[in-house]
Amino acid sequence: MNESDKIIQRSQLPLLGAYVEPRSPTEKKLAEVWRRALGMDRIGITDSYEDLGGDSLLAASIIAELETSFGTKMPWALLADAGTIEQMAATIDNLKEGAK
């Protein structure tokens, strides 16, 4: 809520840091999934899941969607351990590489 007791939507909140656009296919897919789950217009690869309002319920749905999208089992602690799209993409790329 703001000072006038009006509810503020997440998408109206100021960006927490400088926006860094997704570069790799993995980062782009993660940004797409995070945007849908968090109801935001734009998420950069250095934005923190927790700072954006992510919680454990959203994390469960994000992990399930990522497992389907990438065809790889994802650890449930992935979001907590990585925290950003950039870090998460590196972990997922390593998981996919290790599965080959």
Protein language model features and the residues they cover:
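Phosphopantetheine-dependent thiolation modules in NRPS/PKS and related acyl-activating systems
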Residues: M1-K100
